[in-house]
């Protein structure tokens, strides 16, 4: 409350100019011996491979593979995880893409491209993608609903998933 009163009484506070400027993170150089250098190296060598491995073992990729070939024969009760689990793949792609911009790694780049192939194949013809629905559009996961976006205010997580997919795309193509 007090800061609002002060800023209303002191209009110059709102007009001050910051003496710092943002720079693209790719222009910031860190030695591998620094705290952040160690952290990014650990992310590249341990965290990101583990996260991709978990996506594989927890069925995240298989949901995308099934979504690439939707079928009324798919029993959505056997869907791997929850309607928001597509984001595990997207967030891992995003983090890995940021790491690649500071510490290039051709093996990691190729792996990301292979995951992106799986994701792209799962998109519907108009670009829509939510594996919990796309796997079997006639009988989607109960959280998703029979029509796109119809349960967004409940549990479908369609916008949540879309937002994380866009974040991953931006990071990858920067």
Predicted segment positions?
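Bacterial N-terminal signal peptides
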Residues: 1-7
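Glycan-recognition and catalytic cores of secretory/periplasmic carbohydrate-active enzymes
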Residues: 10-174
């Amino acid at each position: 409350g007090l800061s609002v009163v002060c800023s209303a009484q002191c209009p110059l506070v709102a007009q001050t100019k910051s003496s710092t400027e943002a720079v693209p993170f790719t222009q910031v150089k860190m030695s591998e011996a620094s705290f952040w250098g160690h952290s990014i190296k650990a992310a590249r060598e341990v965290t990101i491979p583990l996260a991709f491995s978990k996506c594989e073992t927890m069925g995240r990729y298989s949901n995308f593979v099934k979504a690439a070939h939707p079928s009324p024969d798919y029993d959505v009760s056997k869907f791997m995880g929850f309607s928001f689990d597509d984001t595990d793949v997207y967030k891992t792609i995003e983090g890995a893409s940021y790491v690649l911009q500071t510490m290039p790694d051709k093996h990691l780049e190729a792996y990301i491209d292979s995951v992106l192939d799986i994701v792209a194949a799962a998109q519907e013809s108009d670009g829509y993608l939510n594996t919990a629905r796309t796997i079997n559009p006639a009988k989607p996961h109960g959280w998703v609903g029979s029509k796109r976006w119809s349960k967004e205010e409940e549990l479908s997580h369609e916008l949540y998933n879309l937002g994380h997919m866009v974040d991953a795309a931006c990071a990858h193509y920067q």
